[in-house]
Swiss-Prot record:
A GO CC term attached to the entry: ciliary basal body
Organism: Bos taurus (Bovine)
Annotated localization: Cytoplasm; Nucleus; Secreted
Keywords assigned by UniProt, alphabetized: Acetylation, Calcium, Cell adhesion, Cytoplasm, Metal-binding, Nucleus, Repeat, Secreted, Zinc
Record protein name field: Protein S100-B
Molecular function in Gene Ontology: calcium ion binding; calcium-dependent protein binding; kinase inhibitor activity; protein homodimerization activity; RAGE receptor binding; S100 protein binding; tau protein binding; zinc ion binding
Source organism, top-level taxon: Eukaryota
């Protein structure tokens, strides 16, 4: 498997490690999203401690307005982070 294919599998696996702990196994609730960000993105994003920060992140990601983050919305989030990291490292 190529590095990119491994990355795709890893993204799917990480999403499903956190989704469904509290409900729909195909969506992240706010608490699941917070835990995912704090555990899996700690080198790129600050730890989320305040509920209002979680609310704002979810509001930004939740394109269909259901109050949860589905896989497509999660991937849009990953794309935003990846783009920001690319721009940061490009200037170093």
């Amino acid at each position: 498997m190529s590095e990119l294919e491994k990355a795709v599998v890893a993204l799917i696996d990480v999403f499903h490690q956190y989704s469904g702990r509290e409900g729909d196994k195909h969506k992240l609730k706010k608490s699941e999203l917070k835990e995912l960000i704090n555990n899996e993105l700690s080198h790129f994003l600050e730890e989320i401690k305040e509920q209002e920060v979680v609310d704002k992140v979810m509001e930004t990601l939740d394109s269909d307005g259901d109050g949860e983050c589905d896989f497509q919305e999660f991937m849009a989030f990953v794309a935003m982070i990846t783009t920001a990291c690319h721009e940061f490292f490009e200037h170093e």
